[in-house]
From Swiss-Prot:
It is found in: Mitochondrion inner membrane. Its cofactor is Zn(2+). InterPro entries: Coq4, Coq4_euk. HAMAP family: Coq4 (MF_03111). GO terms for biological process: ubiquinone biosynthetic process. It is a peripheral membrane protein. It is an enzyme of class 4 (lyase). Belongs to the COQ4 family. This is Ubiquinone biosynthesis protein COQ4, mitochondrial. It comes from Candida dubliniensis (strain CD36 / ATCC MYA-646 / CBS 7987 / NCPF 3949 / NRRL Y-17841) (Yeast). Transmembrane segments: none annotated. Keywords: Lyase, Membrane, Metal-binding, Mitochondrion, Mitochondrion inner membrane, Transit peptide, Ubiquinone biosynthesis, Zinc. Component of a multi-subunit COQ enzyme complex, composed of at least COQ3, COQ4, COQ5, COQ6, COQ7 and COQ9.
Length: 323
């Protein structure tokens, strides 16, 4: 009887201990869960309120590398229509346009892109210095005139005497079927003033043709480019003189080598800077007087030389056929 009572007492004590252990475990789990949950809530609240800052070890490096800007973000343009390019983009444009200009010289888009990709800043700065050193050049940079059919008033130029610069210019335009309105705006040259200097060079190109009498056929273009390069120093003109003749016939290369290259180099080097000519203000001037003042001699008529050459070849074939 006594043993049975003791045994029952032990069983009850064990059950009480188990209940206590279970209760303590439940309380401990609840307390721990409440602590963790509370901590997570605090972290979540800080994140939501922007109070929690995560330190990114790459952040400092990225800021130094990109100066706080996303990679390859194009900077703001320097003037309306300007497209700023990275150096690698300029290299790619030069490579693509040079290949296009060589195989398709009739495509103006390649010539335009090649010209702007090779018009490097030191060359344009040298031209700016040359213009600033001349009273007329300074006036051009200050007034920044643009050449169009309206600004030049082609109708008025056709009414001028035959010996004037304006009449020679408009006659050349009509003969070659070209227009000053075809000169596209500069887009890829940095700095607004340097871009204008290149735009001025581009728009004056037809005047160089007019005062020399050279046509826009490939030989005439090459001769004018050599003349420009010797006088103004634009790199594309030199590249054209170097590579364009590779696609010509032997007879064409011979004419350039023996007649037009010597003329272009001599007259380009020893004449006054063409970049400082304010063409719009001398349209009524005698063209021969202007050539004399500038130190420019006219080359032989290229179209006549070609006609004489083809007539000679035709005669030779006829004589060979009779034999």
């Amino acid at each position: 009887m006594l043993k049975s009572t003791v045994s029952n007492t032990r069983i009850k004590c064990c059950r009480i201990d188990q209940r206590r252990n279970y209760l303590f475990t439940a309380l401990a789990s609840s307390a721990l869960g409440s602590f963790l949950w509370s901590k997570n809530n605090v972290l979540a609240s800080k994140m939501e309120n922007g109070e929690l800052h995560y330190h990114d070890p790459n952040l400092t490096f990225n800021k130094k590398l990109f100066n706080g800007k996303p990679p390859f973000e194009r900077r703001a343009p320097d003037y309306p229509g300007h497209v700023p390019l990275y150096n690698f983009e300029k290299v790619l444009m030069f490579l693509g346009s040079s290949m296009g200009a060589f195989f398709h010289p009739e495509e103006n888009k390649y010539i335009v892109a090649l010209g702007e990709s090779t018009a490097i800043t030191p060359i344009l700065q040298h031209l700016r210095h040359k213009m600033l050193s001349d009273p007329v050049g300074r006036t051009i940079l200050r007034e920044k005139p643009r050449m169009t059919s309206d600004s030049l008033n082609l109708t008025y130029l056709r009414s001028l005497p035959d010996n004037t610069i304006g009449k020679n210019y408009v006659n050349w335009l009509d003969k070659e079927n070209v227009s000053p309105d075809t000169r596209v705006p500069v887009r890829y040259i940095d700095n607004e003033e340097l871009a204008y200097i290149y735009q001025r060079y581009r728009e004056c190109h037809d005047f160089y043709h007019a005062i020399t009498g050279l046509p826009i056929i490939i030989e005439g273009e090459i001769a004018v480019k050599v003349f420009e390069f010797a006088n103004i120093g634009i790199p594309m003109s030199g590249l054209g003189a170097l590579f364009a003749p590779l696609r010509l016939k032997p007879s064409q290369r011979q004419r350039l080598r023996e007649i037009y290259y010597p003329w272009a180099i001599k007259n380009g080097l020893f004449s006054k800077p063409l970049i400082n000519v304010y063409w719009e203000k001398i349209l009524e001037k005698d063209v021969n007087e202007f050539r004399q003042e500038m130190g420019i001699q006219q080359p032989p008529d290229l179209r006549n030389m070609r006609k004489e050459y083809f007539a000679k070849k035709k005669l030779e074939k006829q004589l060979q056929g009779r034999k």
